[in-house]
Amino acid sequence: IIEPSLKALASKFNCDKMICRKCYVRCPRRTPQRTCRVLTWIPQARLPPRATNCRKRKCGHTNHVRPKKKLK
């Protein structure tokens, strides 16, 4: 059982984020092959909750951001 204050603090740092749509699409998919090169994961831009633009240069600092999906 988690205290409500600790749960709010944890969700602030882990769940209350914005995700860049362009950076998220460009991430490679995980495939069941055994090569390490395929399984490398490029992190998408996880932005602060009030972000309006992405911080990454690869997507051109786009303003296509969405809220991170909530846990069930």
Curated annotation (Swiss-Prot):
Pfam family, one: Ribosomal_L40e
Gene3D superfamilies from the UniProt entry: 4.10.1060.50
Family note: Belongs to the eukaryotic ribosomal protein eL40 family.
Keywords attached to this entry: Ribonucleoprotein, Ribosomal protein
Record GO cellular component, one term: ribosome
Misc remark: This ribosomal protein is synthesized as a C-terminal extension protein (CEP) of ubiquitin.
Single GO MF annotation: structural constituent of ribosome
BP terms from Gene Ontology: translation
Entry protein name: Large ribosomal subunit protein eL40
